[in-house]
A protein has these predicted regions:
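Extracytoplasmic ligand/sensor domains, especially the bilobed periplasmic-binding protein
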Residues: 104-212, 260-285
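Short, low-complexity disordered leader/linker segments with a strong preference
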Residues: 1-39, 70
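Extracellular/periplasmic periplasmic-binding protein-like sensory domains
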Residues: 251-321, 328-329
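Conserved small/polar residues in nucleotide/adenosyl-binding loops
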Residues: 331-340
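Extracytoplasmic "Venus flytrap"
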Residues: 41-62, 85-92, 114, 182-190, ...
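Hydrophobic alpha-helical segments within soluble ligand-binding/sensing domains
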Residues: 94-95, 155-178, 191, 219-221, ...
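Sec-exported extracytoplasmic/periplasmic mature domains
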Residues: 62, 66-73, 100-108, 124-131, ...
Length: 340
């Protein structure tokens, strides 16, 4: 109950903050299209190390926008037209260019980005300078908490400052006495690895090594060999399921060095189950989410819309888009052009 209450309070604070920001923008040149159309940006890693996760995330956000449009209640019957862009998850320059394309296209707000590094780059270099509200459903780096965002960047996912502690608690509960840690070499990986390492050590668990890996390589046998030489009851893989993280796991299995893997949120999804199969039977991980009534309602709505909501951050993507819509609904304006 306390967790649910805290979440509701946090969501309310976000809505209020977004509304306050929007209400200061009435004199700005409109960013919406003609004929009651409001353009909204969706920027996620449609290519790259989490490309198997983002289609459902984008579809969930678009579902919220569609519901608002179909209701006829959005600012006198205005409709929302989503515009997609590719963050790549890992290439900040490409992500920034993609976000600039959304701004040029006239979006009023941005749902995204996904991975923490590109999210910070887009917020700092594009969203904040242009005064465009941005809500990420999945950027979890603790560093984003102190981002100089001028009050227009928000998240619907919890920080890894908490996520790393929870993953460490699960590790202890599973009876693991020693771990090797590998992390994707970016803000998300390093931030979560630091929190997780400190938390497992606080539980009395030995950390044999902490090493970074790069995404997009064809071979991870060298990384697997380094981790194998350090040893441990399990290998904690803090990374992405479609590239580096998967590669390290497969190389470790091929070498016979580990058979138990501890997975961060970026490692959880159907594609890695399809790729690795039963060799993951001893493995476990953690994923932010909710088990409350709202989660069940969303799952049913998503299913009806043909969206698989079982993957990470689908609900958070819907929530991020819905928060933008709610801010529009609650902001009294004579024209849809003044909404955002």
């Amino acid at each position: 109950m306390a967790k649910n209450k805290g979440l509701l309070i946090a969501m309310a604070v976000i809505v209020i903050a977004v509304i306050i920001y929007f209400s200061t923008q009435q004199s700005k040149v409109s960013k919406t299209g003609v004929g009651g159309e409001i353009k909204m940006g969706i920027i996620l890693g449609f290519t790259g190390p989490i490309e198997s996760l983002t289609p459902a995330m984008a579809a969930s956000a678009e579902l919220a926008f569609k519901e608002a449009s179909d209701s006829g209640s959005l600012l006198g019957g205005a409709t929302i037209s989503p515009m997609r862009a590719d963050s790549t998850c890992v290439d900040s320059a490409a992500a920034t260019a993609a976000a600039e394309g959304l701004i040029s296209g006239g979006v009023a707000a941005i749902m995204g980005a996904d991975c923490s590094g590109v999210t910070g780059a887009i917020a700092t270099n594009v969203a904040v300078p242009n005064g465009v509200v941005m809500i990420s459903p999945s950027a979890t780096s603790p560093g984003l908490t102190t981002l100089d965002d001028k009050g227009i960047f928000f998240r619907t996912a919890p920080s890894d400052a908490r996520g790393g502690q929870i993953l460490a608690d699960i590790t202890k509960d599973r009876g693991i006495n020693s771990v090797a840690i590998t992390y994707t070499n970016n803000d998300y990986g390093k931030g979560l690895a630091d929190v997780y390492e400190a938390a497992v050590k606080a539980h009395g668990i030995t950390v044999s090594t902490v090493t970074a890996h790069e995404d997009g390589k064809a071979d991870y046998s060298s990384e697997a060999a380094t981790l194998a030489s350090a040893g441990g009851d399990a290998l904690a893989v803090i990374g992405y399921l479609d590239q580096g993280g998967k590669g390290v796991i497969q190389a470790s299995l091929d070498a016979g060095s580990f058979d138990t893997f501890i997975l961060s949120d970026g490692m959880i999804g159907q594609s890695i189950i399809d790729a690795i199969g039963s060799d993951l039977n001893k493995s476990f991980g953690s994923l932010p989410g909710s088990t409350g009534k709202g989660a069940g309602v969303f799952a049913e709505v998503a299913k009806t819309a043909g969206i698989d909501s079982s993957g990470p951050y689908t609900g958070e993507s819907y929530d991020a888009a819905a928060l933008i819509v709610l801010a529009c609904l609650l902001y009294t304006s004579p024209s849809p052009r003044d909404c955002l």
